[in-house]
Amino acid sequence: MKIIEIAKKIEKNGGRLYLVGGAVRDHLLGRENHDEDYCVVGIEEKEFQELFPQAIKRGKSFGVYDLEEKEFALARKEIKTGEGHQAFKIETASDITIEEDLKRRDITINAIAKDVLTGEYKDPFGGREDIQKKIIRATTKAFQEDPLRVYRVARFASTLQFKVEMQTLKMMKQIEPELKTISKERIYEELKKALKGISPSLFFITLKQADVLYTHFKEIERLIGAEQPKQYHPEGDAFVHSMEVLDRVAQVTEKEEIRFAALVHDLGKGETPKEEYPHHYGHDKKGIIPIKNMCRHLGLPNKWEKCGITATKEHMIGGIFHQMKPSKQVDFIERVAKSPLGLERNEDHCRSRWKRDSRF
């Protein structure tokens, strides 16, 4: 059954069908999106089941069904019942409007609906204008009811290359006490998606702007203010440098573990006593423990950890590679080749880091 036929069947029974969420956003951005989600307005759940007996309900979810390999959700409201991102009471009813359903969504660019039959947009929060301006903005103050939205916003910044507006950053900070309620599995999923983004650095930069980076990424937060020799690093501190390296590596590989290795290759600089700035003697060895700690408390894959450790242990060799004996050069190449990191090193990263003096 085609979507248009489903929409007409719903209309005959007094309802409307809307395309919602990321599919609408990505269509307006000219991006591909094969995950289409629909919102059913104006009919009760029992009516929907009678109209589409082939629809499969998703677990114990409230009014969410799989039909024709697409997701259909009855319009609903969410009421906060406690602390955390799962403490919500969900209500579905035929008198809930599409505008009310959109109100519960996190940011304006995700709160746009498109009528399947007429093509008319429902955009009560100005999401289309924010898409044009490349801005991420919370729909309402209800944004603060779900702490996971902090990481979702940061992830959208990295995948869309959008800027988060000031009031939303302030709301992200206000939710900070509840961030501890988010499971490490959910944080890992958001981090994984962010690392796949066009500019993965924006995930961490956004969290820094909201002053919540330290909550789950304290190892990276310690890089902020870690001064480096200006003759080698005119870009700024170790945090700025790591963000630049991450984005350059992202330009040449889509592998998450390689991007992660770029992110953490200089974590050892966060362990340097301030009185030793701008030098970071032995930071390649000092970086191993922070990488292990970060991977442990976030539950990151072993492959990510091994790649990160290889990156921090070996990234200083490039500066002296041409001075090494051939046998030592071969040993180095073999070590990297046998590691999960492999020889897929970012050429630009090598030029920017390995050809510099290694004394820092």
Predicted regions and their residues:
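Catalytic cores of the polymerase beta-like nucleotidyltransferase superfamily
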Residues: 1-360
